[in-house]
């Protein structure tokens, strides 16, 4: 409970920290015809000076936590106004301003628990915190706010903030109960009307805003979510009007509504990063297209050296196009034009030691364990591999790879022995793409469903043994697949064919990675948790305080993705093989999504990459001991789970207290039945009846938002910045003997490879986007950190959190030591690129390391 009684007429000194809107404002992007934006607009706003806050434009009223009025609500103090500017305060962050305030409070009003704030100005500001000092018998009271405050006339009820106490609903001081309930009611809204910029309402909707049917049938996209054909997690509701041609689709606009406090309220270089993403998709993309239309630059790369030239000389572009790109700070940083008429990219890590090591079989295989998509490979349990596609519709899709293909390279084992010894592995890109392959190949892209079988060698590395490329059967789907099997070769035209076979595999892997491993399994699945948490858990609820840092900026980046990246004609559709079917195909994969399998140990066991073994440190034994993502990930997973367990057990003294928590039960019920409503009847959902269920659920949410996202996101440019290594689409089939393409492959294998994979224009767009996505913002908050040290007043929770941070620091040292162990060949590989993606800390920029708390880019 806060403090002791205050003496009658006692003055309480306070400090209010806020940020002016003009400090945080990023100009909207102007039309393509003009200069793209102006960066941060640091001057010329309505709030020219801090003195605008002095006088009576902002009022605060303290609320008692122990003394109630006639309605049973905490007593209100007198309205008080900001008094003076504090010019020096050591704890002030960038762009923050501090003001003095003095409240009158008497002992008849009891102990402080909350405050109201009103803004009478026309312009909103960002309230960071209120700190009350020298409270008798207590010291300081902290209110962590981090919220936009708009003009009071825009709201039916006053804005309220609670002190940093933590209460289960049953433990809330009686005078605060109604305030707590009212605030949650305000955040839920009534589910009607179009949401306005200043609102903080959290609600659900289906993904019905990716297409633009009013532009024509070709621009329509199916509704994802709310139907059995395309189930999907829910997104935040905006309430925009339906399109004219399709009442089930929502009209698009240049700004996507977000609950106001989900938009950036911090001076973050990711303001620039996300602004850069928007600029690339809306402005740079058409500008580059015009350069290609004018034939200013050849449409194809001519050689691998020309691709490497992107990082030295760059791509020459017309002066007027450069002049439109370079004024924007983020793009100046991304493209490094250096005053030259060229776009230049930083050299990706994968070629910093060797320009050709990416071509080796060992590196191709190693990236399945330590690359940007390290959680798809599985242990082969049956041979030949079979399909789960409905044979009534698609016929027989059993693999055509035979034992004779594999056994010459099994180090003396038979296939059966290799399977028994868990030494054969499969990277399967067959079932997700096959039902769409006819449609994909009817466009300018040409691709295969692929299966890759690999063998675990005695030295602990993986060796690819065979790649199967499959097409829909010419005689119709029910006839099964038409398949070819390719084997490794290291010289002659066969080696060029083998390199192409690997490229078709990587194209599928790139698409699956971007749309499923990255977008669906982190960004999209987390959004319903954010919505449910904010609708049902009060800010003083212990689980809200646990999870809230792991939601930072996620709805914002997801809204931007719907606007510019995964929409009709967006960056993903333009640069990835799946094209217009991209997000639709991820919905088909979501049918197999299981929440409880998102826990790393469960995922590894499901893929056959680990076996339950209580004698091992994490309760499981890895099938491949040197599996960098799994080895490092298990350390992080355990640290998260230990921290969550300690924290949950501080507040729930028994399973009964959890079952009787109305906020938690309502939150979980709605998450299952609405947020992931297309999965509501699945038997695997935790019933949320025990503390252990809550621990596991919270650990999965935190793991997904932090470490899993880091593992699949921040390696995108280090690995994929070389399009040769991670092509995103393929444009022609494997050349057949006797054809002109085969002859070209024999005479000029590099040119044939480049004519097959992502062309130059799409490469430039892809690199521009993944370079931004792979960067850390300057004020990123990493796992084990909080953006405010006063996030809770509970010293027990603070001590447990400190132990968590210390554990992560120890893990970081251990991971770095592993990278120096030459016996662990999969950690660095032929490209000599140590696996650092799960090192918790990082500096700003393109670092190939660091685990942010949340999906913030």
UniProtKB/Swiss-Prot annotation:
GO terms for molecular function: linoleate 9S-lipoxygenase activity; metal ion binding; oxidoreductase activity, acting on single donors with incorporation of molecular oxygen, incorporation of two atoms of oxygen. Changing residue 57 to S: In strain: cv. Provar. Changing residue 201 to I: In strain: cv. Provar. One of its GO terms (biological process) is oxylipin biosynthetic process. Residues 212-257 are annotated as: Disordered. The lineage of its organism: Eukaryota, Viridiplantae, Streptophyta, Embryophyta, Tracheophyta. It comes from Glycine max. PANTHER family: LIPOXYGENASE (PTHR11771). It is an enzyme of class 1 (oxidoreductase). Changing residue 630 to T: In strain: cv. Provar. Belongs to the lipoxygenase family. It catalyses: (9Z,12Z)-octadecadienoate + O2 = (9S)-hydroperoxy-(10E,12Z)-octadecadienoate. This is Seed linoleate 9S-lipoxygenase-3. Residues 38-163 form the PLAT domain.
